[in-house]
Amino acid sequence: MKLKSIALILMTVALPAMAEKVSVNTKGMSLILDVENGKPAQYLYFGTKLNPNDLQNLKVATDGRMDAYPAYGLNTPAEAALAMRHSDGNLSTALVATGCDVKNEGNASVTTVHLKDPVYNIKVDLKYRAYNDVDMIEAWTEILNGEKGTVTLTTFASAMLPIRRGDVWMSHLSGTWAAEGQLSHEKLQPGEFVIRNNDGTRNSHTDHAEVMFSLDGKGQENAGNVIGAALVYSGNYKLKTVTDDTEYHYFFAGINEQNSEYHLKKGETFKTPALALTYSTQGLSGASRNFHKWGRKYILAHGDKERDILLNSWEGVYFDINQKGMDQMMADIHSMGGELFVMDDGWFGTKYPRVTDNCALGDWVVDTKKLPNGIEGLLNDARKNQVKFGIWIEPEMTNTTSMLYEKHPDWVIKAPKRDAVLGRGGTQLVLDLSNPKVQDFVFGVVDNLLTKYPDIAYIKWDANMAIMNHGSQYLSAGDQSHLYIAYHQGFAKVIDRIRAKYKDVVIQCCASGGGRANWGMLRGFDEFWVSDNTDAMQRIYMQYGTSYFFPAIAMASHISAVPNHTVFRTTSLKYRIDVAMSGRLGMEIQPKNMTDEEKALCRKAISEYKEIRPVVQFGDLYRLVSPYDNQGLSSIMYVSEAKNKAVFYWWKLANFYNVHLPRVKMAGLDENKMYKIKELDVIDNKPLDCEGKSYSGKYLMEHGLEMPYVHEVDWGKKNDWSSRVLYLEAE
């Protein structure tokens, strides 16, 4: 995380050793604990920031299950955040407070509540990092084994949060390959609601490690009280909400302990990933804006820098890489105003040339039959064509048909005494990042490229296989259950080494599409590939859901060819452009197959996107109409921090004769300002009625503007796709 680079201000505040309300505050919210020496630390409150009088009168809930970090053993029916087997075999643990302190870290403060077991030498620190400039609190736990022998951790949540029962709804994301980020809203009912991941390498294809709780009924986008929670972890996770016979829902989040019990050696400390918590009184979109601001400033690499408009080669040529073709694609994207060209899979392999997906991963040497002038030749072409150059790698993986596997079969994850289950191409395996030698190798893949070719500006880092074979050839027989955790500890070490040496390179996080859209992974990356499905219609749904937790600057959204290569739908070029312009704009197409008219439309759109790019990538998101509400359209908008500029998106989702769509009311504007309207990416023969006119923010938010359902174009160009992008500037 970026906080690792913030100088620690050496100020520690010790709190009194008596009953004490410990207040963890941001600018707009508070998390309150009751910490009394010799007693369990307890939750009092999480919500909007309390004034001193309300804080003084806050009472401790009498329910003993309000412990801030409940441990298993003495209240066995209760759900536990921590469970362990002590070195003598005892399964019971009790935790009482021993003190509290606060340290300032740049733009944040870290409150530590110290707990210990009165019988065993086990210490647990509850950590809370509160930011001064964004409403986000990160909660995590550190467990120290002071016993004489090894302690086995069987449950080790990052945090637990009690939520008062009522009409509480949960919003979360699910999906699969090519259909990531699907949004669901569900009322919490008695019982357990569990979201978990067991993939091993990628953790956001099927479910996401982030949720929102709407406290006033089914969530509204721009009104209502909402708790947002995101587990900042790249590996297997478990989010669990327990609703029993008490007055509370109990939300637990942390590493998925399934097949991952951890043997904590004497003197060793185990640190859980952080759970990022936010609170919004402005609905679901308000919680999203908090995540976006926090992510841009404290998690993403280069979260304050505009992203380049790029052309990626994958859907244009797939494995058919060659020097002349790459040069032509660079020239084409430059001619349309693009700034970066990325060469995808298929450029490497000598003994086993990468002409398909069944070989050569791990053999990161240029195939000179395809690229006789090598990477340097491509960089020369990029300079000639005045674009930056990027390259695809998949460094965590190998194929059985590779020189790497032939040399180091002991480097792969493989169950002993069993034939391996193979992945993509029938030959793919995952390298064991718990092994320091493998960590060195993976770091070396990037290091060798960037040392030899320092002008490489962008890396697309892919990961196309789960950990299918549980077995580490590096870890001891007794520590095989550490594999899932040790893999991601090793991964983090590699990314930290890369970022320490190569601070400026842009790195995209790709994993069979959107398999790594999570804040734990993004701590060293600039952006992620939302999905391998580039169909504009389905991207509206996926990007709407994904925007609940991730900002536009991190969401790679590309214009692709039709029929779409995944769902075979044919949409208009304008529609594809208008969807892609709502994220980090790029192209996933073979330009030589485009007509001059299509290139001209893209050239115009890219030029206009450059004008609105700061608003889209750094502005506040307001979701207006959900595609999931079956109203026949979807709409969002971005508003600059000063509320002097905004970009409004409107996409029609269904086409029926005599259809009646709602007029969309805008949000986030200054009601007292006048905004001049300009349509972007225009294809119509006549302007919109609102074109060039000015409206008050109050009018736009209370009444909105009518959008024509069809485009006014010549008969031969009519189709069933309609979309609008409006640029608003305050006068």
Predicted feature locations:
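Aromatic-lined carbohydrate-binding/catalytic grooves of carbohydrate-active enzymes
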Residues: H302-G444, Y453, A457-Y458
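Carbohydrate-binding surface patches
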Residues: G28, V211-F213, E221, P627-E671
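Conserved, mostly hydrophobic/aromatic
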Residues: G28, T141, G267, A382, ...
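C-terminal beta-sandwich/jelly-roll accessory domains of carbohydrate-active enzymes
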Residues: A654-E731
